[in-house]
Amino acid sequence: MTAVRDPFFPADQSIRASHNPIEVRELGMMDYQRAWDLQAELNKQRQHDEINDVILVLEHPSIYTAGKRTQPSDRPQNGLPVIDVDRGGRITWHGPGQLVMYPIIKLAEPIDVVDYVRRVEEALIHVIRTHGIPNAGRIDGRSGVWVPGKTPEEHRKVAALGIRIAGGVTMHGLALNCDNTVEFYDYIVPCGISDAGVTTMSQEVGNDVTTQSMTAPLLAALDDAFAGRLVVADHSFASAPDPTKIPRRP
């Protein structure tokens, strides 16, 4: 699913149904359940054209969220709460120092979920590369943005994606590790991937990269990617099995 392929839309065409500006809501630190409820409400409003497209910008208190393909063996044993959510993928961690964005975007017809995901990844790759990690890219077979290591086991994930489309409108989104701890990843199998690591912008560039410093550049890159001004390219440096290709939990 991560390999670049011809999208339904030309690469330089907007994937959004609307040409109105995207509204941005910076929410600060917000409880995950509260943010999820807000997403669901905004998603329904966007389906009925009661609001314009919007991107929620926030951080979460420390918590695990489990996507539809999470396995029992993925789950933590450290006592932190786990919320089962309706996005794709498996389990991940959210917490302070991690920049989270939830685009609520009505997609143009015909809906191309893969193209949408690739555009979000392209925005992340552009910003990560221009802020000190020039070799960041994709691993074919796995979503998100990665920093290559000398061996496959040393590849490190710096940004994660989890997407849902409801009524033609996107939910959930992306998480960019800025200056958060990676301790809590040790208690899970993050995104179902046991043969690679997790990193942060700060660890890779050697100085403090805050969520605040990354917010404006990432919002601009997302806007460009959705509009077709930032064109999806093949930034793959490796391939690996897709851990999500297992049955969904009930």
Curated annotation (Swiss-Prot):
UniProt xrefs under PROSITE patterns: BPL_LPL_CATALYTIC, LIPB
Record keyword Thylakoid present: no
Site entry (Lowers pKa of active site Cys), positions: 157
Keywords from the UniProt entry: Acyltransferase, Cytoplasm, Transferase
One GO term (biological process): protein modification process
Binding site for substrate: 87-94, 160-162, 173-175
Pfam family, one: LplA-B_cat
Keyword Cytoplasm: yes
Cysteine disulfide partners in this protein: none
Pathway per the UniProt entry: Protein modification; protein lipoylation via endogenous pathway; protein N(6)-(lipoyl)lysine from octanoyl-[acyl-carrier-protein]: step 1/2
Enzyme Commission no: 2.3.1.181
Reaction(s) catalysed by this chain's protein: octanoyl-[ACP] + L-lysyl-[protein] = N(6)-octanoyl-L-lysyl-[protein] + holo-[ACP] + H(+)
Residues of the active site: 191
SUPFAM superfamilies with a match to the protein in the record: Class II aaRS and biotin synthetases
Cell location: Cytoplasm
Gene Ontology molecular function: lipoyl(octanoyl) transferase activity
InterPro entries in alphabetical order: aa-tRNA-synth_II/BPL/LPL, BPL_LPL_catalytic, Octanoyltransferase, Octanoyltransferase_CS
Gene Ontology cellular-component annotations: cytoplasm
Start and end residues of each BPL/LPL catalytic domain: 49-230
Further details from the record: In the reaction, the free carboxyl group of octanoic acid is attached via an amide linkage to the epsilon-amino group of a specific lysine residue of lipoyl domains of lipoate-dependent enzymes.
Family stated for the protein in its record: Belongs to the LipB family.
Function: Catalyzes the transfer of endogenously produced octanoic acid from octanoyl-acyl-carrier-protein onto the lipoyl domains of lipoate-dependent enzymes. Lipoyl-ACP can also act as a substrate although octanoyl-ACP is likely to be the physiological substrate.
Protein name, per record: Octanoyltransferase
